[in-house]
Amino acid sequence: MSPSHAKLATVLLFDVATASADVGGTPSRLTKVARIADLLRRAAPNAALVAIVVSWLSGELRQRQIGVGWAALRSRPPAAAHPTLTVVAVDAAFAEIGAVAGKGAQARRAALLNALFAAATETEQTFLLRLLGGELRQGALAGIMADAVARAAGIPAAAVQRAAMLGGDLPAVAAAALSGEASALDAFTLRVGRPVAPMLAQTAAGVAQAIERHGGQAIFEAKLDGARVQIHRAGDQVTVYTRSLDDVTARLPEVVTATLALPVEALIADGEAIALRPDNSPQRFQVTASRFGRSLDVAAAVAAQPLSVFIFDILHCDGIDLLDAPTTDRLAALDALVPPAQRVDRLLTADPDAAGRFLEATLAAGHEGVMAKAPGAPYQAGRRGAGWLKVKPVHTLDLVVLAVEWGSGRRRGKLSNIHLGARDPATGEFVMVGKTFKGMTDAMLDWQTARFTELAVGGTDGYVVRVRPEQVVEVAVDGVQKSSRYPGGLALRFARVLRYRDDKGPAEADTIDAVRALY
């Protein structure tokens, strides 16, 4: 056995499972960071082991998907008496399960899963169940994990955060940080062909507030209701990524063609792909989203509903990194490169009335609102930075469904009233802020009944069905009010469902602070 494999064998699944339980059992951020850092020191300097531990404690598999649904986890064999499973052995088992394909794949996958659970203790089984079921919520969010990596490596947290921002892969950054090489994180730079986490926006109550928060002047842009895309070009090679950093190049040939027409050799751009009607008004979001399906006949889809691409930011252009440049400089580079037909409408103003007219015109054109950007702000990749504020005609929030109630009357037999949670950035948990059954079409009721049956935890026999907190839903609200009914002390006013956001994960849901900001 090589020294590296011997190192891998020294950390057991039990060690990770108990650390996960410890982290989930404390509300203290400092205690969470210290506990994770302690485990990471034990795993260092083995890069593979560090990456596995960081992935698991972040609630993810290195393999991402291995074909194991919740139904396969409902029954499990008796637990082992003593812990013997190593982290590397379990990771290898996940890889083996994920590689199963062809005739009899389901039975073979089930047998491998059963063997894995049979070798696990009760503590380990509980951890595996939550990890594979997507329910591992012990509060180890990216910020906490980055702090833990920094503490374990003895380096500034800002260095880890920036490397993760540029590398788009915290496990890889953690492995480098704990390798013992002082300059290991220097390799994580902005690089064409490697996606970075997109910048996200906070919410403003109106254009006047947005101008005030940006210091008296703001750049307003039309907010398109399409699909976020990050475009990379290196010579004749174009790659297109979604907001979750999935490669969708093959599904969006129009974006590739439009990018190749630009007079540039090296480019990283942020933009929106959107389906338009013949009069250039936007189609419903679902029409755009249908172009991102995995089992898509691309040629037929392009013929039936072509997409247009609009670029609203540039991060790199022909050897020049613009990530840290102010918004005005990035937009100047954009205007010099991208033709007007592929830019979003824009207005720089300090006048709330002018901004209000711009918002009204944008809404009249069929778009969902405006973005207000600070002229001097950098591009804060991977962060919901204060440099971008979204303004919509009604307040909207992206929340997570925590539970759902069976309907009555015309909705009997349908899962109807959804319980809504906002993310607590301090703990990683979700705080319930209200319920709603409004805004749901018959088709939506059918869809969510199937979806939440799949996500159900503990069966669907009761009136209230608890679900794994994975489904993000966009709701419109008239505001919030104080309430002792919910743990956050606030309740949504007149919440109604706008759409389900399959393009967003629960970590991208709005925070309880965003809800409080509407009070």
Swiss-Prot record:
Residues reported in the UniProt entry to bind ATP: E221, R228, R243, E272, F312, R384, K390
Q: Which cofactor does it need?
A: Mg(2+)
Q: Which domain of life is it from?
A: Bacteria
**GO BP terms in the entry:** cell division; DNA biosynthetic process; DNA recombination; DNA repair; DNA replication
Residues of the active site are K223 (n6-amp-lysine intermediate)
Q: What is its EC number?
A: 6.5.1.1
**Catalytic reaction list:** ATP + (deoxyribonucleotide)n-3'-hydroxyl + 5'-phospho-(deoxyribonucleotide)m = (deoxyribonucleotide)n+m + AMP + diphosphate
Keyword vocabulary terms for this entry = ATP-binding, Cell cycle, Cell division, DNA damage, DNA recombination, DNA repair, DNA replication, Ligase, Magnesium, Metal-binding, Nucleotide-binding
Q: What does this protein do?
A: DNA ligase that seals nicks in double-stranded DNA during DNA replication, DNA recombination and DNA repair.
Which family is this protein grouped under?
Belongs to the ATP-dependent DNA ligase family.
Q: What is this protein called?
A: Probable DNA ligase
- Organism equals Mycolicibacterium paratuberculosis (strain ATCC BAA-968 / K-10) (Mycobacterium paratuberculosis)
- Taxonomically, what lineage is the organism? Bacteria, Bacillati, Actinomycetota, Actinomycetes, Mycobacteriales
Gene behind the chain: lig
